[in-house]
Regions:
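Short, Lys/Arg-enriched N-terminal segments with co-localized hydrophobic residues
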Residues: 1-3
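Formylglycine-dependent sulfatase
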Residues: 5, 11, 19-200
Length: 200
């Protein structure tokens, strides 16, 4: 068995290696949504492909990468997110239930992508209790967040959790999408980006 941390390192190294071969590192957009099975994305050709097509996600899959052999290490929100972020199983990273947390300094995906020369951002549902401090930029829902009229936490002058932006008239999906589009428009263009875009 290969430890998850090593797999995460190998994947990061592979992306950096590809970038050095072709002279330019690829931008990376990681989209996550809660309870979203692969067969719900028509690019995978599942039973829902004709009933509920996903043409925009299909286009992204065609132009980028489509994981054909990926596994969820935990079936609930916080632990699953912690595994992706740390590259570790939950019994190692400590996030074993919905009260899970990943402390700054252990948010390895953000740290390693930053070391590889990427501008890192986390936008949307975080649900890991503590500040996503290892990202260059973040704009995250507090806890599970609200579906309608959400607030998001941002980095600012006040302590973690006190710097908020409210979206009283929006659904969380629209607010998260708008925040991501604004960040993509305003970000530093001289660096490639690694963006974790998480829906509720």
């Amino acid at each position: 068995k290969i430890p998850m941390k090593k797999i995460l390192f190998i994947h990061s190294f592979f992306l950096v290696f590809l970038g050095s071969i072709f002279g330019k590192k690829p931008n990376i957009l990681f989209i996550m949504s809660d309870d979203h099975a692969a067969h719900a994305i028509s690019a995978y050709g599942g039973q829902l492909a004709k009933i509920a097509p996903t043409p925009n996600l299909d286009r992204l899959a065609k132009e980028g990468a489509l994981f054909q052999n990926a596994f969820c290490t935990n079936s609930i929100c916080s632990p699953s997110r912690a595994c992706v972020l740390t590259g570790q199983y939950n019994h190692v990273n400590g996030a074993v239930d919905l009260g899970g947390r990943v402390e700054p300094g252990k948010q390895m995906l953000a740290i390693e992508m930053g070391k590889a020369g990427y501008e890192t951002a986390m936008i949307g549902k975080w649900h890991l209790k503590v500040e996503p401090k290892d990202f260059n930029y973040y704009c995250v829902l507090p806890g599970q967040g609200k579906y309608h009229g959400p607030s998001v936490r941002i980095r600012g002058d006040k302590p973690w959790g006190k710097n908020l932006i409210d979206f009283p008239e929006k659904h969380s999906t629209d607010a998260i999408t708008d925040l991501t589009l604004n960040w993509l428009k305003d970000r530093k263009k001289e660096k490639p980006f690694f963006l974790m875009h998480h829906y509720k």
